[in-house]
């Protein structure tokens, strides 16, 4: 059974926040399970989210819920373990809608992930995400 691997000890970073308004649009809203809140990036050609986990994990799925009109046509998941450089795990191709989308991930043992959103549907390159979930297992 795959579980959400993002926990309070997971350190997250984002490429940008709309108008630097972290209270209303900050990264914490990616993981709060609240349908009313979201991370809203500022404009730019490529937006990203990094996650540093407190232990090694084995990723099996990535779930993302965009706001339609502010999604990405292509995404890339990269990961690393320890001090290794990030390497590509998988490319994924979201649809431009409001649904929670699930992307299978080839088994990868990592403690750091980077999700990059490219080719955004918004003319200015903004991305709006209500939920970001990393599913899999914690390594013992």
From Swiss-Prot:
Gene3D superfamilies associated with the record: Galactose-binding domain-like
Nucleus among keywords: yes
Keywords recorded for this protein, A-Z: Nucleus
GO cellular component: nucleoplasm
InterPro entries: Galactose-bd-like_sf
Superkingdom of origin organism: Eukaryota
Cell location: Nucleus
Family: Belongs to the NR2C2AP family.
Function: May act as a repressor of NR2C2-mediated transactivation by suppressing the binding between NR2C2/TR4 and the TR4-response element in target genes.
Oligomer status and interactors: Interacts with NR2C2/TR4.
Protein name: Nuclear receptor 2C2-associated protein
């Amino acid at each position: 059974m795959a579980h959400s691997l993002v926990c309070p000890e997971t350190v997250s970073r984002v490429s940008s926040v709309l108008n630097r308004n972290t209270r209303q649009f900050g990264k914490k809203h990616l993981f709060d399970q609240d349908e009313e809140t979201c991370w809203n990036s500022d404009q730019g050609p490529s937006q990203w989210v990094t996650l540093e986990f407190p232990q090694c994990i084995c990723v099996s799925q990535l779930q993302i819920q965009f706001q339609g009109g502010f999604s990405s046509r292509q995404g890339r998941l990269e990961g690393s373990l320890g001090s290794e450089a990030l390497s590509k795990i998988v490319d994924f191709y979201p649809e431009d809608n409001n649904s929670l989308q699930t992307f299978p991930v080839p088994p990868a043992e990592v403690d750091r992930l980077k999700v990059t959103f490219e080719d955004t549907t918004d003319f200015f390159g903004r991305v709006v995400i209500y939920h970001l979930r990393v599913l899999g297992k914690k390594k013992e």
